[in-house]
Amino acid sequence: MFEKGEETVHSRLFYDNPDYAEQQKVTQESFPTYVPSARVHTFHKFLPEEKFYKSHPEYFALRGDQRLPTQLCLTNPEVLAIVKDSVASLFEQYPQSKVISVSQDDNQQHCQCDNCSKIDEEEGSASGTMIRFVNEVAANFPDKMISTLAYQYTRKPCKTKPLENVLITLTSIECDRSAPIAEKCADFANDLVGWGKLTQNIRI
């Protein structure tokens, strides 16, 4: 909790003033070189609920005894095949784009089926299933970059190293940005160090 008089300082993603952006050495584009329609939180774009949920609930997250269209089941081989095909189609549609996001949707209802849970336990984090899944996608597109999120339940680093063409977008949304992260966001700082041991491709 913040004490009275304290404020959280949030970085701006978009810079309306080009002079200010130049001074700060920040691009005015929030996602340069990305496929325009696949920049972040993309799972629902690859497997839309309205297209797949009724006929293939097994493609989606198991929570308790229910399949929910909140996230994907990342150990289902058919899900992997569909995502690979979707990524290929988008790169064909936007040949100048160099990066696409293959990333969780904006909720914490990730799959807890036996297969996904086993991997997450082995990896020490739910990022385990994510990185293994994203690596499988990235292996098909060696000349492109596949971005994914280290966010909420996937922020803690796993054991599997991302491939060289995988970009980790590490999110500091929970942090108080009015002070150095080592002072007021130690968990994030530790996660940053952990991911840094696995890859040099980190975007914050």
What are these regions (language model features)?
Residues 149-159, 182-194:
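Alpha-helical scaffolding within the catalytic cores
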Residues 1-142, 147, 167-171, 193-204:
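Feature activates predominantly on carbohydrate-active enzymes
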Residues 172-173, 178-191, 201:
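Metal-dependent peptidase/peptidase-like ectodomains
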Residues 147-177:
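Substrate-binding cleft/loops of secretory-pathway carbohydrate-active enzymes
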Residues 116-117, 161-163, 183:
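Short, glycine/charged-enriched secondary-structure capping and boundary segments
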Residues 85, 111-113, 155-159, 177-181:
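Generic local-structure boundary detector
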